[in-house]
């Protein structure tokens, strides 16, 4: 990291283990930007926030980025993407609900609402968010996770419980037919294409 830091003004690192970012930062003389780790995915959360602002703020073209009170329902694993999205929702004054099977939720933090019922999570939500059920490095847990997440798919019955104006997001790549149906991936409410 020291050698690289001598040649650049910043380092954007996509790593598997978050500890590697921490280790890099101890020897770097330039900023280290987390592009993805097993702990968080802040760049994805920023991109998603911009999509939500573009869709729901009164007039982003003149600098009014207010999305206060909007609700994001994340249906899936309490993982790096969920953690980062919850953090940016808190900063922007949005509500965040996580629907995960027992044992896959994020720790309670007093901000987010956690449920084990996807229908409860999406009720009236402005944004429905899906992510892969089997993250990078978890391939050995695929069968177990797919079984645990049965019933946590973004599909038409779930979308029908959200607000009429709701959009669907996914950090991609998506396993269509698993965590999200083709119908919802390509629907008019999808902000994926």
Regions found by a protein language model. Give the residues of each.
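Generic hydrophobic/aromatic pocket-lining and core-packing "Φ" positions
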Residues: 1, 21, 85-86, 118, ...
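Phosphate/diphosphate ligand-binding glycine-rich loop within oxidoreductases
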Residues: 1-53, 176
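Short, structured coil segments at secondary-structure junctions
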Residues: 7, 27-28, 92, 110, ...
């Amino acid at each position: 990291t020291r050698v690289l830091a001598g040649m650049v003004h910043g380092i954007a690192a996509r790593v598997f283990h978050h500890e590697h970012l921490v280790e890099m930062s101890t020897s770097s003389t330039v900023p280290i930007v987390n592009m993805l780790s097993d702990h968080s995915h802040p760049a994805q959360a920023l991109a998603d926030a911009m999509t939500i602002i573009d869709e729901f703020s009164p007039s982003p073209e003149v600098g009014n980025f207010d999305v206060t009170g909007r609700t994001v329902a994340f249906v899936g694993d309490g993982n790096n993407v969920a953690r980062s999205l919850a953090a940016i929702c808190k900063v922007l004054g949005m509500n965040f609900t996580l629907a995960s099977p027992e044992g896959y939720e994020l720790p309670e933090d007093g901000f987010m609402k956690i449920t084990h019922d996807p229908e409860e999570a999406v009720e009236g939500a402005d944004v429905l968010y899906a992510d892969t059920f089997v993250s990078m490095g978890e391939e050995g847990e695929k069968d177990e996770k797919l079984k645990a997440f049965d019933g946590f798919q973004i599909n038409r019955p779930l979308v029908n419980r959200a607000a009429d104006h709701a959009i669907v997001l996914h950090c991609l790549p998506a396993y269509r037919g698993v965590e999200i149906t083709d119908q919802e991936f390509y629907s008019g409410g999808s902000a994926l294409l």
